[in-house]
Amino acid sequence: MKKIIVTTCLLATGFLLTACGESQSSNESQQTTIQFMHSSVEQERLSVINELVADFEKENPDIKIKQVPVEESAFNTKIVTLARSGKLPEVMEVSQDFAKVMDKDELIDQMAVQNVIEESGEDNYYDGAKNLVRSEDGKSYIAAPISGWVQGIWYDKEKLSEAGFSEPENWDDILKIAQHFTDKENKQYGIAMPTAEGTMSEQAFSQFALSNGANVLDDEGEVTIDTEKMREALSFYQNLSQYTMPGSNDVTEIKDAFMNGTAPMAIYSTYILPSVYEAGNSENIGFAIPTQKDQAVYGTVSGLTISSGLDEKQKEAAEAFTAFLSQPKNMEKWVLMSPGGAQPVNKQVVELDGYKENEVIKSFGELPSEIASAFDEVQVFGLVGEKNFTKMGDITSSGVIGKAVNQVTVGNEDVDQSLADAQKNTK
């Protein structure tokens, strides 16, 4: 407890009247202070977070929130450093992948997170968003989703329509459209797609693999890269890459090709939408999901997690603050820090007037609702049923999938050999 020294209440008689300091002293001593670490360092975003914190503290005068804003590029390293020194913040914004790392090291209070999700209404979240933050055994959660993004195939509705094509519904449709629009002599391509040796290539390829029933792990957590279903998917991806730009394509090349009209289709995340809006082309963009045996959307979520080992007051305060941020009206404010790019993970948010009437969201018509509902179709490597294997994070970090994609697309190497090597290097 802090000692409050009251100097202004000293009277000439030498008596100390404590009345003027008692109220403030009592309030401060009863407050529980917790830290909230997040990556919203930009002034506009920080203003939104400040407002949310102020609203919470007004409703909960016995809890004080101390913010710890950290640049996204340094965020995970900062958490590791704080964890080693035993100084983890009580509440943290985390990606689904890093939440797995933290959970593996027993840094997350799963029960506290579970309490928040139950209080917020488990059924209010899109199933895919919930699955991404399930614990490895599928029985609990490692973060409460607050926003996310999904990836699929974006297409120019006008160009496809003029060429006699409707929205691509399966692999064959995608291939036919890509073939039609490719004119390499004039540097026109059918689809802008990831081929670089990196995470984006793994993410893009995963949609085709999972839509064909191929996963990197089975329900026992065993590696299943070198399989017939995976071979079919990678062979298709290799074939499709004939109709993309030459070389190793990553984020910048793909976005630029779609935005400047070099390609009428692109595999990209929802973070392409703000640029489409700024270009005044909101009504002309469509969204398709790679489909073969099944639909498969790649998606990711940002969540709020609660650190383990807290005392009872800290834990209660952390749960209360996380539950507050998980209320639809507050999730709406969080998502609208990046309208179009960040997507709601709670079904109630898309029904709020503030979300629907946002200038950017409104410009896309029914598309935002269609995209948000795509969270129900989210599938990712390592998520098998309700099991969310933490070892998938290590496999992604190793780069074996992205390397295989790059080998067969840019390097035109043999699919069978690339998968065999990936399987061998993963075990």
Annotate each language-model stretch with its function.
Residues 39, 99, 203-204, 235-323:
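Extracytoplasmic/periplasmic substrate-binding proteins
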Residues 55-125, 158, 162-169, 264-265, ...:
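Extracytoplasmic "Venus flytrap"/periplasmic binding protein-like
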Residues 177-180, 220-248:
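Glycine-centered hinge/linker elements that transmit conformational signals in sensory
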Residues 100, 275-282, 293-300, 304-399:
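C-terminal lobe and pocket-closing loops
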Residues 102-106, 127-169, 194-219, 298-307, ...:
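Periplasmic solute-binding protein
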Residues 112-126, 195, 212-232, 278-280, ...:
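Short, solvent-exposed loop/beta-turn-alpha elements that line the ligand-binding surface or hinge
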Residues 96-150, 175, 285-288, 367-372, ...:
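Hinge/lid segment of periplasmic solute-binding proteins
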Residues 161, 373-427:
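Conserved C-terminal helix/tail region of periplasmic/extracytoplasmic solute-binding proteins
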